[in-house]
Regions:
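Phosphate-group recognition and catalysis centered on beta-loop-alpha active-site segments
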Residues: 2-282
């Protein structure tokens, strides 16, 4: 059950909060306006023959609340290469799509995911994010609901495991394979043991090793797991030297998070073709 404190917050304090804030609703509306996507093609970066393969960070979070089903649907609609999500595990061992380990003010609810059942989480609605008023009936998705968005599409689901868990990884693999997404889905994590475990469960699933910097050690660790293991590295932490190292080692990689045309062009000119973004499109 939701804790007594959480009930007090949800049933008493939140309504008071919004009644006090009601005069400022125009400001809230202003802060939740969608942002216009910035086209790389229109700014001379990439082409249909040699494109940048873009990952939508937590879905297209410029047009819909991050990690919501509408944000992933926008990724498919706008032709993104992949759409990244984050998953956490509920009290009743269901994988759900949310970045933080707890629900927060974006849902006007509070509590740790690991302390809440799926049924309890499904009572929470989005109350913050681009176009939120259009998606007032949206709920935190399950992993299965997220994956269903990509069945029969060209956009790849990209699943980041957000917690240190090993005994429920088979549920992730099963959800992927049951939908025929084995060759389409990507699983990524900072945890090498989780990557190895996923690889052992199904070596056909593509894995991305999340790292800050692309070092010789990180490259060797990824290669040790298998041929279909990429690096997903921080754009801010990697120099041209790091990029050249990865290329010379023949390891595939993607850089996050790139949000300006200038950054994307500089990377493109260096030969980088895979980036993650909040705002760019082709």
């Amino acid at each position: 059950m939701i804790s007594i404190i959480n009930k007090i917050i949800s049933l008493i304090l939140v309504p008071i909060y919004f009644s006090v804030l009601s005069p400022t609703y125009p400001i809230i509306y202003l802060f939740n306006q969608p942002k216009e996507l910035i086209s790389l093609y229109e700014n001379g970066v990439g082409s249909e023959e040699d494109p940048v393969y873009l990952t939508a960070h937590r879905g297209v979070n410029a047009l819909a609340p991050e990690n919501s089903l509408p944000s992933f649907e926008e990724a498919v609609k706008n032709g993104y290469y992949s759409a990244e999500c984050d998953i956490q595990l509920t009290k009743d061992n269901r994988w759900v799509v949310i970045h933080n380990a707890e629900v927060d003010g974006r849902f006007c609810e509070y509590g740790r995911i690991e302390d809440l059942t799926l049924k309890e989480l499904k009572t929470f609605s989005y109350n913050w994010g681009p176009n939120v008023w259009k998606y007032k009936d949206s709920r935190i998705p399950t992993l299965e609901e997220y994956l269903d968005v990509f069945v029969g599409t060209q956009t790849r689901p990209q699943i980041e495991i957000g917690i240190e868990n090993y005994d429920k990884l088979d549920n992730i693999v099963n959800a992927i394979t049951q939908r025929g997404l084995t060759k389409q889905a990507i699983v990524l994590t900072y945890n090498l043991k989780q990557l190895q475990a996923i690889h052992d469960l199904n070596p056909e699933i593509e894995l991305w090793y999340l790292v800050d910097e692309m070092t010789p050690e990180a490259i060797a660790q990824a290669k040790a797991i298998g041929d279909n293991v990429w690096l997903s590295a921080s754009y801010d932490k990697n120099t041209e030297e790091n990029i050249k190292l990865a290329m010379s080692e023949n390891i595939n990689f993607s850089l996050f998070t790139v949000n300006t045309v200038e950054e994307a062009k500089a990377l493109y000119d260096m030969g980088v073709r895979y980036i993650e973004t909040d705002i760019l499109c082709n």
